[in-house]
Amino acid sequence: VEKLTPETSGMETTLFSFMADSSKKFSYKKRTEISYNTNSSIGYFSKLSGSALYLNAMDKHFEKTLPVFLDGFLNPTFKQDEYENTMNSLRQRIQGIFNDPESFLAYTISNELYKGHPYEAKTFATPDSIKNITIENLKNYHKELLANGNFSVVVSGKINSDFLIKKLNSTIGKLKFSNEETTRKNVQPISIQKNAPVTLRHSSAEGTAYITKVFASPANTEPDFIPCVLAGNIYTDILFNVVREHYGICYSPQSYVIGSKAPYGIEHLFKVSDFSNFEKTMKEARNYMANDKIVEKTNADGSYEFSTVEQNLEGYKNSYINQTYQSQQTSAGLVSILGYNLIQFNDIDYDLKQLEQIKQTTAQEILRVFKKYWVENPSAWFAITGENTTLNFGEQEQ
């Protein structure tokens, strides 16, 4: 459940890192020894809608590794030296955002688009929130997590179910939960309006530019989301063949929609070298997609070879399915997807519904959503470049 605020950004991620790396009953040396001898690992991931702690172990070692996993979840230790090492890593990550032009651009875009929105909070520590990530606050956050009982246990593999149930009952089963009902935040979509381009300056972007065009896109629970994902994959190939291969505008272009409750879509150019014509060539590529023309290649005489969305649709569907669902072939991958389903959708089988929608998506749906979101929706430009570079954003420039 979305609990983070801008002031507590990074708190949950930091807590879960301690839960993955420490526990009361098992020293660091003992945990490392068990991990090495059993070829197992404990990790975590954090989203704005929730976090997950996971154990990856062979079935035959489950009875040896589960106690380590549960003790980390229930009894993480917050030793001062480990805390200081963690905080140093957080400070380095924050500095890394500002040192890298592309990361700083993405950070700025997120801050601008989510100002005053629940997603103004971040899963990672920020310059404004890091001072709040104290040992005391981490302990309190952990207590709240256990008291609310707002978590689920997901298991996959050929394991001894009697042992699992007995172990869970003797640990998590002894927790006393509060009667307070936890509700999910009502996360509203964001609105993006056409405005003057935002251009940042960075010494490491001297002689090049990173340019992003953003627009509002559908939430990952809406019917238009899957067609938009496929549209982005197809359009990325058109951008590559037009913007990079034909005109040599940049090193790499791409387009995609973010999967969340309040997302936005992106057209991004990585390492731009032509500062005057990038907008014009992007518009050309956009027009081809809107008119159902996939650019396959550029001929020797400079002309294009085209195909249609319908002609290529099955290939794009299969590619997306393989990239997204191939991890289900392992128990660890399956648990990861099931956990994500619960965190993001509160529905453990949601990926199966999306898989069916992928199979049913038509070329007409893809073209419709592309025109609606990429072409007709208002968009905003953001860029980062060197101190003296002038970027031509075309007709949108004010």
What label would you give each PLM region?
Residues 1-75, 86-95, 101-128, 148-156, ...:
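M16 family metallopeptidases and their MPP-like homologs
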Residues 115, 152-219, 383-398:
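An aromatic/glycine/proline-enriched structural segment found at the starts
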Residues 145-148, 204-206, 373-376:
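Extracellular/periplasmic catalytic domains that process cell-envelope and extracellular macromolecules
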Residues 235-239:
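Short Ser/Thr-interspersed hydrophobic loop/turn segments at strand-loop and sheet-helix junctions
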